[in-house]
Design a protein with these regions (language model features):
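A short, proline-enriched helix->beta-strand linker immediately N-terminal to the Walker B motif
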Residues: 91-95
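A short, surface-exposed alpha-helical micro-motif characterized by mixed small hydrophobic
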Residues: 139-141
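Conserved ABC ATPase "signature" region
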Residues: 39, 43, 50-68
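ABC ATPase "signature
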Residues: 157-158
Length: 187
């Protein structure tokens, strides 16, 4: 059971509780303005008009999407497109958000904006965020719980403090801590 539902028995309702952003796959239609993609997603998820407009206005403000809404996805920079992808994944107000490498390839300003937005989304809307990343700064900024996986094995399941307690030396970075864990497990 997830969120009180059996996923394979209540697939349609279950999917409405999930938002997904994959770095290499887009839910935005490449040659149409972002707003057109959003309106199609509104119809797919059967979002009531008032809720859609309210959510779109909120996301547009928080992610600074104003001038981007009338631009085709193919004309956006990577950072702009990622912000639009994140908004697309949240239009239907999911309870769970899967983010795969949400800051990969982004400049420093865009990374900070995306991280700040994810934190706010989690805090204000109680959205559960499942994040996969190789960016240790993402982990440090966003993670309450860390699962470290290597070659299909669970190496660590704990808090960020638990991860940091494995420091090979006092001033070790998260990259160095994880590299040491991988060495310890011969990964």
């Amino acid at each position: 059971m997830i969120n009180g539902r059996t996923p394979w028995k209540e697939r349609k309702e279950h999917v409405k509780d999930i938002g997904v952003v994959f770095g290499q796959r887009s839910q935005l239609w490449w040659d149409v303005p972002i707003l057109d993609s959003y309106e199609l997603l509104r119809d797919i998820y059967e979002i009531p008009t008032h809720q859609y407009q309210e959510t779109l206005d909120e996301l547009t403000g928080l992610l600074s999407l104003g001038e981007l809404l009338r631009t085709p996805a193919r004309q956006l920079s990577l950072g702009q497109r990622m912000r639009c992808e994140i908004a697309a994944s949240l239009l239907h107000r999911p309870k769970i958000l899967f983010l795969d490498e949400p800051t990969i390839g982004l400049d420093a300003v865009s990374k900070l904006a995306v991280r700040d937005f994810i934190r706010k989304q989690n805090k204000e809307h109680k959205t559960t965020v499942l994040l996969t990343t190789h960016d240790m700064q993402d982990i440090d900024a966003l993670a309450d719980r860390v699962l470290l996986i290597g070659r299909g094995r669970l190496l660590l399941d704990g808090t960020l403090s638990d991860l940091k307690s494995h420091r090979p030396k006092e001033e070790a970075t998260l990259d160095e801590i994880i590299a040491a864990l991988y060495r310890d497990y011969r990964i």
